[in-house]
Amino acid sequence: VDRQRIDSLDDPDVPVETIRGDITEESTVEAITDAVGEANLVLSDMAPNVTGEYDLDHARSVHLARQAFEVALDLLGAGGDLVVKVFDGRDLDDLKSDIEGEFEYVREVRPDASRDSSSELYLVAKHRLTAPVREGDEIEVEIVDTGEEGDGIAKIEGFTLFVSGVEAGETVTVRVDDVKPQYGFAEPIE
């Protein structure tokens, strides 16, 4: 996706579809969704046209990164990854925190190819979480089975939650400690 025309690739064995559009416009987002369906990776190298005013350039880069993040939320299935370029600055922590809430982990990567004075970095978010629970949630669950390690197993909308120190047949209130793309861990609340 680019606002400018993208030259087609010469290799017919590599199917690449290009979209000329502006990621901040709904019609472009719809074109992406229609073309891709579900993805394993969303990679955004977008950057604003720089003005030389650091705070403005940073804010505009965060806005573009958020647009890519929103597209990723629509396109990525469980376990999918996001890589997004952004300029370092005061709004980076808020953006990173928002992304962390949707992925197993997020890292800042500063490419070696960037100039030493560059504020450019990439947020690399791994393993999209689509679970119906999040870390810190307190919920009541029914223990429906026992796992190989002896933990109780609860099912929430098809999602497996391992609960320590309980047995099948119990109904307990738990606090979710850790969430992975396909399963999570919780402890009973006394």
Where are the regions a protein language model picked out?
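SAM-dependent transferase fold signal centered on methyltransferase-like domains
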Residues: 1-190
